[in-house]
């Protein structure tokens, strides 16, 4: 399930899938279970999610992802 019921913002399946994909890709990069779970904490508003964006070389679109985090 992509949608986190703890998130209080706008429910947008496309945004959740996009944010969740970052955590999945980051998990695949490091193969550490805590990466995937920590990345999703606090509706993606955390330092691990931000680090994953950097590690996945998504630096040029960070603002787009941060905007998504603020939406959900």
UniProtKB/Swiss-Prot annotation:
Disulfide topology: 7-43, 23-39, 26-52
Free-text description of this protein's post-translational modifications in UniProt: Stereoinversion of L-Phe (in CHH-I) to D-Phe (in CHH-II) the two forms are present in a ratio 3:1 (CHH-I/CHH-II).
Alphabetized UniProt keyword annotations: Amidation, Carbohydrate metabolism, D-amino acid, Disulfide bond, Glucose metabolism, Hormone, Neuropeptide, Pyrrolidone carboxylic acid, Secreted
Similarity comment: Belongs to the arthropod CHH/MIH/GIH/VIH hormone family.
Pfam families assigned to the protein according to its UniProt record, in alphabetical order: Crust_neurohorm
GO cellular component entries: extracellular region
Cited function: Hormone found in the sinus gland of isopods and decapods which controls the blood sugar level. Has a secretagogue action over the amylase released from the midgut gland. May act as a stress hormone and may be involved in the control of molting and reproduction.
Coiled-coil regions listed: none
Localization, UniProt: Secreted
Identification of the protein by name: Crustacean hyperglycemic hormone
Keyword Transmembrane: no
Tissue specificity note: Produced by the medulla terminalis X-organ in the eyestalks and transported to the sinus gland where they are stored and released.
One GO BP: glucose metabolic process
Keyword Disulfide bond attached: yes
UniProt cross-references to InterPro entries, sorted A to Z: Crust_neurhormone_CS, Crust_neurohorm, Crust_neurohorm_sf, Hyperglycemic, Hyperglycemic1
Modified residues (Valine amide): 72
Primary localization class, coarse: secreted
Pyrrolidone carboxylic acid PTM positions: 1
Gene Ontology MF term list: neuropeptide hormone activity
Residues recorded as bearing D-phenylalanine in the entry: 3
């Amino acid at each position: 399930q992509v949608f986190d019921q703890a998130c209080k913002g706008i429910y947008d399946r496309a945004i959740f899938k996009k944010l969740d994909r970052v955590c999945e890709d980051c998990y695949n990069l490091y193969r550490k279970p805590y990466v995937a779970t920590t990345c999703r904490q606090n509706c993606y508003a955390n330092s691990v999610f931000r680090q994953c964006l950097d590690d996945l070389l998504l630096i040029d679109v960070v603002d787009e992802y941060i905007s998504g985090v603020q939406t959900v």
